């Protein structure tokens, strides 16, 4: 109506029935999600859904994922071992059948960047995974493996998705890095480091305490 240039609409945590951890089920806020997606697609819009990989007990894949997850709970949910092909298959199949086939063609993959520098909200370095990885190794690979899983869900569908952590030399993934950086020093560090990934970065400048910053 106002000729605002926009072709990707992103839905944040409220689309889930439970967001921390995630249910991957549509909230009552969206009573007819498939019809909504069809209408938006017909108008030329792409729909991008926010999520993270920690699966709430109400998630349809929770039971199947129990034996393919790390040994800690995060926000009351399990976290899949995406280095395990079966975990990727379960996660990707659900996303494809429930969301992608309905018209979703992008995802915003959050909360996969925890480290010693970002607090203790995620799984610890001492975690163990069915694939044999430990928590330290999995923190480094989490974002890249998450992207790989979502690419399997999307099949050959074109996408421009977002991820909060990915490794170096990741230019083969159609994702954009983003970050929740609240400190100016962290922001500058991100500027310097982002090019190693080989993909675009969209920074969020949250705070400036001086004119110089």
What are the language-model segments listed below?
Residues 3-213:
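Aromatic- and carboxylate-enriched substrate-binding clefts and catalytic-loop regions
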């Amino acid at each position: 109506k106002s000729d605002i240039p926009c072709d990707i609409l992103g839905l944040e945590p409220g689309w889930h029935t439970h967001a921390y951890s995630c249910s991957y089920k549509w909230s009552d806020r969206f009573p007819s999600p498939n019809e909504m997606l069809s209408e938006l697609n017909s108008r030329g819009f792409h729909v991008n859904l926010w999520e993270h990989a920690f699966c709430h007990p109400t998630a349809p894949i929770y039971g199947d994922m129990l034996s393919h997850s790390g040994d800690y709970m995060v926000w009351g949910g399990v976290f899949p071992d995406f280095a395990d092909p079966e975990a990727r298959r379960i996660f990707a199949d659900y996303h494809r059948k429930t969301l992608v086939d309905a018209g979703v063609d992008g995802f915003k993959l959050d909360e996969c960047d925890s480290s010693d520098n970002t607090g203790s909200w995620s799984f610890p370095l001492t975690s163990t995974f069915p694939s044999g990885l430990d928590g330290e190794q999995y923190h480094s690979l989490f974002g890249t493996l998450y992207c790989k899983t979502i690419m399997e869900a999307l099949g050959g569908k074109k996408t421009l998705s977002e991820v909060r952590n990915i490794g170096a030399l990741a230019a083969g993934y159609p994702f954009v890095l983003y970050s929740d950086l609240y400190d100016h020093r962290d922001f500058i560090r991100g500027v310097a480091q982002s090019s190693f990934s080989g993909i675009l970065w969209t920074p969020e400048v949250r705070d400036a305490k001086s004119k110089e910053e």
